[in-house]
Each structure stands twice: as structure tokens, then as C-alpha cells.
Curated annotation (Swiss-Prot):
Repressor of jasmonate responses. Unable to associate strongly with COI1 in the presence of jasmonoyl-isoleucine (JA-Ile) and is therefore more resistant to JA-mediated-degradation than other TIFY/JAZ proteins. Repress gene expression through direct recruitment of the corepressor TOPLESS to cognate transcription factors. Interacts with and suppresses RHD6 and RSL1 transcription factor activities to negatively regulate jasmonate-stimulated root hair development. It comes from Arabidopsis thaliana. This is Protein TIFY 5A. GO terms for cellular component: nucleus. Coiled coil: none annotated. Transmembrane segments: none annotated.
Length: 131
């Protein structure tokens, strides 16, 4: 069984060149408490990002982590081969087109905050007085 070549399993690092351009892609990141691999530990914590969801597990053995990474790499290879060549990063172009005007966004946020604050104040006042 051959694992993904650009994934260093000994350091448990996932390559930084991976583009997560769709919500149904899989990526795996394993983290330890100190950041350095600890060979004495039987199991370690792992964080899995799958289909737009984040899952945590604190009892994953080294063999299980390798299996998860292997399955994820096979799924990514299958999806990339079915799409042909790698598509451009859609998420960055989407975010650039969807960024609102910062001033308008701040104004809308402030108005929403003030409205909610007004409602909270009215709800907590003993006589529900209107101002």
C-alpha cells in the first residue's frame, strides 16, 4: 500500500499546497499538544475536516491516523482524476467577488447591534417603557 508522496507521516504534516476549493473535499490534520511527535504515546489527538465539518478525536493510534490519511489521499486522487486537471482555486475568486464594502458592512453591523441592544433593554426594564 503506497501513501501520498507529499505527506510526511512521521511529522504528521499535511502539505500546504492543498487547495480546499469545494466543501466536499477531505483534508486531515493531526495535532499533538507540544507540536513535536511523541513516539511514547500510544494514541494522540486528531482533527478531521470533512465535507465542511470538523471532527475531533483524542484516541487515535498511529496506524489509524495512517489509514485515515491513506483513505483521504485516495479520495482526493479520485476526485482530481475525475475532474481532469486541477481547477483554479474557486474559493479565492468567490470570496473576492462577494466581499462587501467595509464601511457598509460596519454600518449594517452597528445598526443590528443597536437594534438588538434596544430590544434587550426594553425586555429587561420592569415597565417595558418605550423611548
Amino acid at each position: 500500500m503506497k501513501l501520498q508522496q507529499n505527506c510526511d507521516l512521521e511529522l504528521r504534516l499535511f502539505p500546504t499546497s492543498y487547495d480546499s476549493d469545494s466543501s466536499d473535499t477531505t483534508s486531515v490534520v493531526e495535532s499533538t499538544s507540544s507540536g513535536n511527535p511523541q513516539p511514547n504515546e500510544e494514541s494522540q489527538r486528531i482533527t478531521i475536516f470533512y465535507n465542511g465539518k470538523m471532527c475531533f478525536s483524542s484516541d487515535v493510534t498511529h496506524l489509524q491516523a495512517r489509514s485515515i490519511i491513506s483513505i483521504a489521499s485516495r479520495e482526493m486522487k479520485t476526485k482530481s482524476s475525475s475532474n481532469g486537471s486541477d481547477p483554479p482555486n474557486k474559493s479565492t475568486s468567490f470570496h473576492h467577488n462577494q466581499l462587501p464594502n467595509p464601511k457598509a458592512s460596519m454600518k449594517k453591523s452597528l445598526q443590528s447591534f443597536l437594534q438588538k441592544r434596544k430590544i434587550r433593554i426594553q425586555a429587561t426594564s420592569p415597565y417595558h417603557s418605550r423611548r
